[in-house]
């Protein structure tokens, strides 16, 4: 697709997907126009949340387009069987990160819970289904845990526990009624869990993505797996690029790389490229913290649950090797 200098901050041309990402973030859209909010080294709230509101236009079926995202564009780093979308100023050596690995280690399940699953943006939901409509609190948002991202977390918790991992699933709402400040609220809750359960070594923050083109087209990441329409899953890794202290972010990247490889070895195409961001997203709290995006607001809940089940089964295989 044709690119123009005006598409990018600093006069650099942006790809199709980068323009979608700009459209999706209020802060990044400000940056594109030359207006940004600056942070400090002490800033703990991810910059993406400062002043951001979850405003999405209503979804109409004729504006939804299916895509399977593979990371084949020039903006992606592909090495070691890994695909990465690097949205920082860092030069990332995937081979060196893979070699150094992650020090994540769990005590046996009998000792206590190992993983905390939560949802900073708890009301994030999926496309409306005429057969099972839900009451919206905003476009593709609902406080009903049977239809929002909490339902996805419930399914992942079930499979993790079925496979032998011990999980706490936090079903509290952190983005309602007030969206801004959600990361501070989920961080405070996570700190309480960590204090109460010292065996917790991993925090997984599950979200759903939102991919919207400049013309209003909603893109949903999806593929067919064993005849089932399945939402793709994206791992998001934070960093210290925005100035906050996060010296071991590369360990989180190494873990994400393991998970991406496992997903795509079992179900090719299930994992979208890993995204590396400038903010920490509270991932500094444990060695195993990651943010996971299951589908987007264009996907149906059934598609998201299909992707969540496969993610859970593949991730559990990796995580169980770190027990003992």
What kind of region is each of these model predictions?
Residues 7, 11-120, 125-129:
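Non-catalytic propeptide/linker segments at domain boundaries
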Residues 101, 110-113, 198-201, 228-232, ...:
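Extracytoplasmic
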Residues 122-125, 173-177, 208-213, 240-243, ...:
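Solvent-exposed loop/turn segments at secondary-structure junctions
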Residues 128-151:
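Glycine- and acidic-residue-enriched helix-capping/strand-helix junction motifs
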Residues 136-139, 211-247:
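A short, glycine/acidic-enriched catalytic loop
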Residues 143-222:
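Catalytic-core regions of hydrolytic enzymes
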Residues 248-275:
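Active-site-adjacent substrate-binding region
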Residues 271-324:
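Active-site-adjacent mobile loop/cap segments within catalytic or ligand-binding domains
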């Amino acid at each position: 697709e044709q690119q123009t200098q005006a598409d990018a901050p600093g006069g650099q041309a942006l790809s199709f997907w980068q323009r979608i990402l700009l459209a999706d973030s209020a802060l990044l859209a400000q940056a594109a126009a030359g207006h940004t909010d600056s942070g400090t080294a002490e800033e703990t709230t991810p910059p993406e949340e400062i002043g951001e509101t979850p405003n999405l236009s209503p979804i109409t079926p004729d504006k939804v387009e299916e895509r399977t995202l593979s990371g084949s564009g020039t903006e992606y780093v592909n090495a070691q069987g890994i695909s990465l979308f690097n949205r920082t100023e860092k030069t990332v050596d995937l081979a060196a990160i893979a070699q150094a690995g992650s020090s994540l280690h769990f005590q046996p399940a009998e000792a206590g819970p190992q993983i905390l699953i939560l949802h900073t943006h708890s009301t994030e939901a999926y496309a409306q289904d005429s057969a099972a409509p839900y009451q919206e609190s905003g476009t593709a948002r609902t406080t009903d845990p049977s239809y929002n991202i909490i339902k996805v977390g419930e399914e992942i918790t079930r499979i993790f526990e079925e496979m032998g991992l011990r999980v706490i699933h936090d079903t509290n709402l952190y983005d309602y009624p007030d969206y801004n400040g959600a990361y501070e609220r989920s961080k405070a809750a996570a700190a309480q869990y960590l204090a109460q359960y010292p065996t917790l070594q991993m925090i997984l923050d599950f979200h759903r993505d939102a991919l919207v083109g400049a013309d209003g087209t909603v893109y949903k990441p999806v593929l067919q797996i064993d005849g089932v329409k399945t939402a793709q899953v994206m791992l998001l890794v934070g960093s210290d690029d925005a100035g906050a202290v996060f010296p071991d972010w590369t360990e989180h990247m190494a873990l994400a790389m393991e998970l991406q490889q496992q997903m795509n070895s079992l179900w090719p195409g299930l994992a979208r490229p890993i995204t590396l961001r400038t903010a920490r997203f509270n991932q500094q709290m444990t060695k195993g913290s990651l943010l996971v995006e299951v589908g987007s607001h264009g996907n149906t809940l059934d598609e998201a649950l299909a992707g969540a089940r496969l993610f859970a089964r593949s991730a559990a295989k990796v995580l169980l090797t770190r027990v003992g």
